């Protein structure tokens, strides 16, 4: 199998697994509070509703990533859609959470690093997919 195709496929799978893991704290506010270092986090129904909607979209994205992994080069557009708006938006939200004082930088930093790595890998994957078409 072509190494570039394998690289792109691995990118999709790794991102899908990380995204799937992110859904768990979305559905458990208590776990979210523990992970994010927010003591006694007990949000209202409005938060729970919004996170339920967000979790539905996240699960849909997981399925989209698994689908794209089946034909990685042909579905390379999913790579760009994952970079912008998904991960760029997540990074901006994390930066906002730190700047507003909701979260500590040390709490958000590992997530930002992971997101930057995924953005770089997906950008490289998109480049590889373009080379495969020629």
What are these regions (language model features)?
Residues 17-21, 25-26, 45-67, 81-88:
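Core segments of alpha-helical transmembrane spans in multipass integral membrane proteins
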């Amino acid at each position: 199998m072509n190494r570039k195709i394998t690289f792109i496929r691995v990118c999709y799978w790794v991102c899908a697994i990380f995204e799937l893991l992110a859904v768990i704290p979305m559905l458990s506010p208590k776990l979210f509070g523990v992970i994010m270092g927010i003591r006694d986090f007990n949000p209202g129904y409005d938060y729970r509703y919004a996170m339920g909607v967000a979790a539905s979209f996240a699960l849909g994205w997981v399925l989209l990533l698994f689908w794209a992994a089946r034909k990685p080069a042909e579905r390379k557009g999913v790579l760009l859609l994952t970079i912008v708006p998904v991960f760029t938006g997540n990074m901006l939200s994390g930066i906002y959470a730190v700047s507003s004082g909701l979260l500590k930088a040390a709490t958000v930093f590992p997530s930002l690093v992971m997101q930057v790595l995924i953005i770089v890998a997906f950008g490289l994957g998109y480049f590889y997919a373009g080379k495969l078409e020629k």
